[in-house]
Amino acid sequence: MKSRAAVAFAPGKPLEIVEIDVAPPKKGEVLIKVTHTGVCHTDAFTLSGDDPEGVFPVVLGHEGAGVVVEVGEGVTSVKPGDHVIPLYTAECGECEFCRSGKTNLCVAVRETQGKGLMPDGTTRFSYNGQPLYHYMGCSTFSEYTVVAEVSLAKINPEANHEHVCLLGCGVTTGIGAVHNTAKVQPGDSVAVFGLGAIGLAVVQGARQAKAGRIIAIDTNPKKFDLARRFGATDCINPNDYDKPIKDVLLDINKWGIDHTFECIGNVNVMRAALESAHRGWGQSVIIGVAGSGQEISTRPFQLVTGRVWKGSAFGGVKGRSQLPGMVEDAMKGDIDLEPFVTHTMSLDEINDAFDLMHEGKSIRTVIRY
């Protein structure tokens, strides 16, 4: 079938809006009509060429919502007409990782997904007869996309796709990191480095967890009003100080902050976040994705004296079994999604959405098909 899509033909170049061909779903696959998709920093990261798994030409997009159109052989968990959110972190329930109960990092489709392919090692997209790669198992920058059954969460059909599409990545990542990775407790202190969608979601999650002091940190003070709306008690612009941000936080508590979250992808900030964590028990959670080949460093003394460095992917949330519940929470108002959507656009305007992101003028732009 034909589908309008925003295709990245080469790194560092604007997306091109073209009509592509989408093949029917094969065994264990599902064809969906995407209704809405967020434009995320991870899409921009891959488009920049810094992503070690980036392949081109590719249909980007991984933060979407849509409706099932057709199912392939053997698919039983969804049917045409079901409302779904594609998952870049699958949940098969059968691999070693799923069976362990210790992680959300299912590996059922990981090997092929990292190569931009469907589980059978081929692609369902083409343009003028030439194959196009998939992206993170989702490719929501196409009006129609094919996704593995294990990479779909079935959601309440009454949910507002313009809002709940954000649960496909950023908001779930931030809120989940608070509850699942850090396990923030009432009264704990929290510092959040970077106030994009993920960082703001961490702030909201910290408020849900009844954290005491919630410190929001960003060099763009225009984000502070929204941070306060989500629950920040303090907002700090590092540029307002003539000393490192670590020292600013240690002035607040000389022993450090109970939980720090790095939501940028800057290895220097990752170190600052760790070294701002509380002596004896502080945790620092890395959420931001650093560039290819970059490494983190600190003195071992920081860990010997009780600090813990952790990472979090998709907030530790298991997509098929747990994400539908988060959609219900959003519908009840327990998760506030509307403020994240600062702009809505058509697919034809998608390059403008990337510009707004790079200029720091948006939190999330949602593309409506």
From Swiss-Prot:
Residues engaged in binding Zn(2+) 2: 92, 95, 98, 106
Domain of life, per lineage: Bacteria
One GO BP annotation of this record: formaldehyde catabolic process
Transmembrane domains' residue ranges: none
Annotated positions binding Zn(2+) 1: 40, 62, 169
Database matches in InterPro entries: ADH-like_C, ADH-like_N, ADH_3, ADH_Zn_CS, GroES-like_sf, NAD(P)-bd_dom_sf, PKS_ER
The enzyme's E.C. designation: 1.1.1.284, 1.1.1.1, 1.1.1.-
One GO location term (cellular component): cytosol
Subunit architecture: Homodimer.
Primary role: Has high formaldehyde dehydrogenase activity in the presence of glutathione and catalyzes the oxidation of normal alcohols in a reaction that is not GSH-dependent. In addition, hemithiolacetals other than those formed from GSH, including omega-thiol fatty acids, also are substrates. Also acts as a S-nitroso-glutathione reductase by catalyzing the NADH-dependent reduction of S-nitrosoglutathione.
Family designation: Belongs to the zinc-containing alcohol dehydrogenase family. Class-III subfamily.
Protein's UniProt name: S-(hydroxymethyl)glutathione dehydrogenase
Gene name of the record: frmA
